[in-house]
Every structure is written in C-alpha cells, then in structure tokens.
C-alpha cells in the first residue's frame, strides 16, 4: 500500500503576527506610487477626523437605515448630496477603484456590443485598459493610431453594434479629438459617451470641472489621488445610466464599505474647505526654491559622513500618471569606500531600512520632493549606521 503523505499545517509563528506593513521614507522619484500605498493623509487631517472614525469603527452606525423614517436608505446618500453640491452632477456612484468603474460600465451597458475607442488611449502605463474592457464582455472597435485619432475615425467605425464612444484622458496625445465632438457624434447616433479621467491631472483640477460642464453620459476617475483619499472609483453622469449601473448585480460586488465612505466624505470636505490639510495640495504647490532648500538641508546633514555628496536637478512623477514631470532636486551620494560599499549595496541596505531611493550611475539619489525634515534626520541616522557596519 502506497504511503499517503499529508501536507503539514504551517505553524503560526510570532513573525506571522507582526504588523504586515511598515512606514517608509519615500526618496524615490515617484510620488503617490501604487507600490507605496498611493496617497496618504496629513497628520493634521487624521487628528481632526480620528474621534469620528473611532465612533464609526467601534459602534453600530446608521449606514443603511434612515433614522427619520425607520426605512432603509442608500448608503451613498450623504456623499451623493455633497458630491452633487460640489460638482453639479446629476447622479453619482462609488465603487472600490476606477478599474472597477470601467469594468462595471462596460459590462452593464455594452456587453456583447461595441465600444469605439482610440488605439492610442489604450497604450502606456501598467494599467491594461484593453484587457479590462475585453474581460467585461464588450467588444472593442479600435480607431486611429498611437498618437493621433480624428473625429472621422470614430464616425467611420460606427455600425449597428455600436453602443458607446469611450475616451480616456491622455495628455501625451499629439492630435486629440475633443470630448465635446465625441458627445455630438454620440448624440447623433443615440450612443453613450463615457470619459474615463482615471488619475485626474492633479496640477490642473479644472480638467474634471470642464468635463462635467459638458454633461457627459458618464465620467469616472480615481478618488485617492484626486481628493487625497482612500482608494475608490467615482462614477458621475446622467441619472438614467448611473441608475442602470446601481441596479446591476455586479455593483454589489464592487460597492464600498463604511470605512471607505467615512474617509472619502472627510477627504472631500477638506478638498472643499481646508486644502491646507491635504498632503497632495501641499506637495504639488512646493516652489522650486523650497525644494532647493530641502535639498540643501539634507546635503548639510550628509556631508559630514564618509560620503561623496552633491545636489543635482531632477524630476519626480505622480505614480503612473503619464506625461507629467515635476521639477525637483535630488541629493546624490556615493560611499568613499566603493569596494566595501558600492552603489547597489548601499541602495539595497537603505531599502532594507525602509528608505526608498533610486540609483543612477553608481550614485544613490534621494529625491527631496516627498521628504520632510523628520525624514532628513532619519536618513542621516540610517546612513551613519550602514557606514559604521560597512
């Protein structure tokens, strides 16, 4: 008789019970990167909302019950009212991220129908929009090329199976078809017009307001970067289409919970009334002189160490937002004993201590865009420890 081996159950060790994520110092060139948890709250914002957040997390709440009528209510009602007041939109829906928004819209409104979309708007970044749309059950009719698409390309693509004209925000496009022209074409042929803003250009928030002013059938974007909030996908648009999405069975799998709704409400509140509390607002409004002063302060702390230290001009970027560079400065370091501690070893040892940098031509570079003075002190201490052990 063959021996039957059973798989041993893994033991629950103390290491498995440690907090799974730790704070890092982001001295890389990518701000609000997905690998780093994307956006984050400022300390003053968190301190302000912490008492209410504690109440929501430690008690039952009226998430879906109306205390005035004793009837069931929509969990989105408080946020819908605020969003409508802020953006003058007909209707709103919130799902767990913008990818969910794209998938839900395509699945609920264009399954087995054609979505006409520019080829160039499916190119670039890690987010594979084409796969998401195809997985929804919709068919894609690609028009144009990687850098140019004209209105006539959309018009020639239309047929009896066409259901939606789809546009994705792409600032790198050389020849872009204005969304208002797509809207006119959609209206002419009784089609849905949908604008996927994705990660809205945070240095130009008018992009969102301009599209909303056109009263699109549908619009979606990411909440975390736009409002410095939790991960969520915001769908706005005409009531007819948003109601169809809300009543679709898939929506229940994609809807957000009480924590997301609470944090999103307070983020939008701060976005309207107290922008100084928003981390994104503070970082993106740094002057070039302020960034240089940050670089000089870090330089002064690192210069006494056994390092070659210099300052250079550089660029940072917002996550995977294509085509947007932020002027900045970096502090470049190199060990004076490169045999014992070359650039790659130094980069790795910093990484292991939670200090995320970039490496360029044997130099380790600290991008100062996301750093603060407490970070400078920690970086100096970590480097001193690494050099003493080298």
From Swiss-Prot:
Main location group: cytoplasm
A GO biological-process term: conversion of seryl-tRNAsec to selenocys-tRNAsec
Cofactor needs: pyridoxal 5'-phosphate
One function term, GO molecular function aspect: L-seryl-tRNA(Sec) selenium transferase activity
Catalytic reactions of this protein: L-seryl-tRNA(Sec) + selenophosphate + H(+) = L-selenocysteinyl-tRNA(Sec) + phosphate
Keywords: Cytoplasm, Protein biosynthesis, Pyridoxal phosphate, Selenium, Transferase
Pathway: Aminoacyl-tRNA biosynthesis; selenocysteinyl-tRNA(Sec) biosynthesis; selenocysteinyl-tRNA(Sec) from L-seryl-tRNA(Sec) (bacterial route): step 1/1
InterPro entries hit by this protein: PyrdxlP-dep_Trfase, PyrdxlP-dep_Trfase_major, SelA-like, SelA_trans
UniProt key word Protein biosynthesis: yes
Gene3D superfamilies: 3.90.1150.180, Type I PLP-dependent aspartate aminotransferase-like (Major domain)
Keyword Nucleotidyltransferase: no
Subcellular location, record wording: Cytoplasm
EC numbers for this chain: 2.9.1.1
Leading EC class: transferase
GO CC terms in record: cytoplasm
Residues carrying N6-(pyridoxal phosphate)lysine: 225
Signal peptide region: none
Known role: Converts seryl-tRNA(Sec) to selenocysteinyl-tRNA(Sec) required for selenoprotein biosynthesis.
Family designation: Belongs to the SelA family.
Protein's recorded name: L-seryl-tRNA(Sec) selenium transferase
Organism: Helicobacter pylori (strain P12)
């Amino acid at each position: 008789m063959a021996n039957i081996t059973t798989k041993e159950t893994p033991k629950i060790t103390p290491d498995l019970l440690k907090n799974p994520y730790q704070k890092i110092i982001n001295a890389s060139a990518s701000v609000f990167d997905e690998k780093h948890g994307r956006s984050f709250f400022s300390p003053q914002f968190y301190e302000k909302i912490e008492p209410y957040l504690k109440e929501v997390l430690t008690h039952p709440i009226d998430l879906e019950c109306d205390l005035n009528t004793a009837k069931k209510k929509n969990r989105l009602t408080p946020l819908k009212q605020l969003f409508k007041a802020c953006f003058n939109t007909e209707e709103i829906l919130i799902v767990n991220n913008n990818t969910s928004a794209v998938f839900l819209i395509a699945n609920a409104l264009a399954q087995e129908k054609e979505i006409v979309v520019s080829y160039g708007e499916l190119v670039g970044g890690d987010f594979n929009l084409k796969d998401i749309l195809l997985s929804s059950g919709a068919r894609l009719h690609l028009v144009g090329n990687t850098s140019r698409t004209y209105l006539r390309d959309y018009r020639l693509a239309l047929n009896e199976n066409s259901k939606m004209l789809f546009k994705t925000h792409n600032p790198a496009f050389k020849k872009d078809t204005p969304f208002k022209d797509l809207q006119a074409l959609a209206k002419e042929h009784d089609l849905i017009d949908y604008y996927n803003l994705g990660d809205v250009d945070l240095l130009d928030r008018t992009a969102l307001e301009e599209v909303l002013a056109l009263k699109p059938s549908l619009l979606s974007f990411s909440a975390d970067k736009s409002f410095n909030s939790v991960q969520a996908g915001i769908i706005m648009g005409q009531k007819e289409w948003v109601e169809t999405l809300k009543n679709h069975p898939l929506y229940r799998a994609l809807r957000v919970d009480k924590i997301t709704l609470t944090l999103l409400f307070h983020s939008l509140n701060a976005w309207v009334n107290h922008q100084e509390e928003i981390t994104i607002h503070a970082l993106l409004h740094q002057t070039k002189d302020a960034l240089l002063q940050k670089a000089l302060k870090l330089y002064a702390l690192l210069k006494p160490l056994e390092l070659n230290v210099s300052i250079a001009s550089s660029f940072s970027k917002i996550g995977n937002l294509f085509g947007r560079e932020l002027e900045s400065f970096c502090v470049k370091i190199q060990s004076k004993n490169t045999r014992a501690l070359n650039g790659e070893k130094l980069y790795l040892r910093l990484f292991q201590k939670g200090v995320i940098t970039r490496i360029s031509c044997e130099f380790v570079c600290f991008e100062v865009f996301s750093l603060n003075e407490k970070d400078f002190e920690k970086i100096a201490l970590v480097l001193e420890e690494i050099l003493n052990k080298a």
